[in-house]
């Protein structure tokens, strides 16, 4: 058996199970769930793992996460193939939940399908007989950093330490026996491009802001109140006035929403709440911009005579590149779709909690097409299931084969050459230092 013969066997099994892979994606698409609430989705993944006969199936990881593994007689290295369980809020999406407004407007149903598709290809082909190591398949919760107030409540109750699922799993030492990680995101790439390789991305600090004023009759005695909404608006205007100080090369993004603007229209608002991120290309840029944002928020309160509580929360670290691992993925992408359909990765102003993993292990986050429309909008729809769900299944599986072939020669070399920014044990203290500025 040569490595190319094994790859063909893996691809045949994925093609044979094409309808199953697409069916899993479509089922998850019409049953979207928000982060740390993905109970049904987690059960779907667990059932798929059981059907494939995966070992060491674990559930309730960071509340809703689920994992399973396959291995050879040689248990290391351990490669984690990740799919994200959660949706986001997009009430206008055609497949939105009518009650919660949750919708898969970022393609996470494709991640789960391709993670399971990878597992199908490797198990049904008997690939581990010819490979050396372990493959851990992970359905990870809560990548979308949303419902910040709800998650902060979970944190205060001691149910989580971090608002992002992979962060929580890292803090809970799930990743302590993992040597490298990879996943494939879905994207709207146009008709010619099928694959975009892994790139870098922004990180951010999450923020909860609460303005406190004084109630009074909004018509009869507004002068006796302290308008917290006015204070909040001045704070937001102050942030906008800071934008010319944000350097272009730092990719700063600040995008607040008011989650509560008061209680009743005829009462001077006394309780106004804001959620926002402060994003940037580097930790230093994020810290600098965050200080400016806090000054603006405080100034709004001072101007009106209100009070403001600012809670800075661990967001996500800027994503780093792992070129050796990305090149293995690239080779397989070119072999399946041709070099003309594979684009280089770029810097993205969005963020993901896999960024935190890139500081402690080799990890990649490439994308496959198959969708149209703008991500995080009601327009984001899968229009090519083959590219969205089946192609990434093959790419993940073939990359695993390359990494674990020949006594895991390639995988071990990447691990040995990788230099972590800090250790997994040090991770818990990293965000504390960042928030202290």
What is each of the regions a protein language model found here?
Residues 2-105, 109-136, 141-142:
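Acidic/His- and Gly-rich active-site-bordering loop/insert found
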Residues 28, 81, 108, 137, ...:
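Divalent metal-coordination and catalytic microenvironments
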Residues 93-103, 109-110, 125-255, 262-267:
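Histidine/acidic-residue-rich, glycine-tolerant segments that coordinate divalent metal ions
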Residues 4, 8-11, 15-22, 39, ...:
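Electropositive phosphate-/nucleotide-binding environments in soluble metabolic enzymes
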Residues 233-437:
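Metal-dependent amide/peptide-bond hydrolase catalytic core
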Residues 81-95, 200-212, 366-375:
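Acidic-glycine-rich active-site phosphate/pyrophosphate-binding loop
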Residues 29-31, 86, 104, 108-111, ...:
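Histidine-centered active-site/metal-ligand motif
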């Amino acid at each position: 058996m040569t490595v190319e013969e094994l790859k063909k066997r893996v691809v045949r099994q994925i093609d044979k199970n094409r309808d199953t892979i697409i069916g899993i994606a479509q089922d998850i698409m019409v049953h979207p769930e928000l982060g740390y609430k993905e109970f049904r989705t987690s059960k779907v993944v667990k059932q798929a793992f059981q059907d494939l006969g995966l070992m060491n199936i674990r559930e309730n990881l960071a509340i809703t996460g689920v994992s399973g593994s396959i291995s050879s007689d040689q248990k290391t290295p351990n490669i984690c193939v990740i799919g994200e369980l959660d949706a986001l809020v997009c009430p206008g999406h055609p497949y939105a939940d009518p009650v919660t407004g949750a919708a898969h407007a970022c393609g996470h149903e494709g991640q789960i399908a391709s993670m399971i598709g990878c597992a199908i290809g490797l198990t049904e082909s008997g690939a581990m007989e010819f490979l050396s190591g372990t493959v851990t398949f992970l359905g990870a919760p809560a990548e979308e950093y949303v419902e910040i107030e709800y998650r902060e409540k979970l944190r205060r109750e001691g149910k989580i330490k971090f608002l992002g699922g992979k962060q929580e799993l890292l803090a809970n030492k799930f990743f302590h026996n993992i040597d490298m990680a990879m996943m494939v995101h879905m994207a709207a790439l146009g008709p010619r491009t099928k694959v975009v390789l892994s790139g870098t991305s922004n990180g951010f600090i999450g923020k909860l802001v609460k303005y406190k004023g004084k109630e009074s009759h909004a018509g009869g005695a507004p002068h006796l109140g302290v308008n917290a909404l006015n204070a909040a608006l001045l704070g937001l205007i102050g942030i906008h006035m800071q934008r010319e100080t944000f350097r272009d090369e730092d990719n700063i993004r600040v995008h607040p929403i008011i989650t509560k603007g008061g209680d009743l229209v005829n009462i001077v608002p006394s309780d106004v709440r804001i959620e926002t991120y402060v994003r940037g290309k580097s930790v230093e840029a994020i810290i600098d911009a965050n200080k400016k944002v806090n000054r603006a928020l405080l100034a709004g309160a001072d101007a009106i005579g209100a009070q403001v509580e600012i809670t800075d929360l661990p967001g996500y670290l800027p994503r780093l590149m792992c070129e050796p691992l990305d090149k293995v993925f690239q080779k397989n992408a070119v072999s399946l779709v041709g070099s003309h359909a594979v684009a280089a990765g770029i810097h993205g102003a969005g963020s993901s909690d896999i960024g935190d993993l890139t500081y402690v292990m080799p990890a990649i986050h490439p994308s496959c097409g198959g969708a149209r429309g703008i991500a995080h909008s009601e327009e984001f729809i899968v229009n090519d299931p083959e590219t969205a769900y089946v192609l990434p299944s093959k790419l993940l599986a073939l990359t695993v084969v390359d990494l674990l072939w020949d006594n895991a020669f390639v995988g071990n070399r990447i691990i040995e050459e990788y230099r972590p920014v800090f250790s997994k044990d040090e991770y818990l203290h990293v965000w504390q230092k960042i928030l202290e500025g």
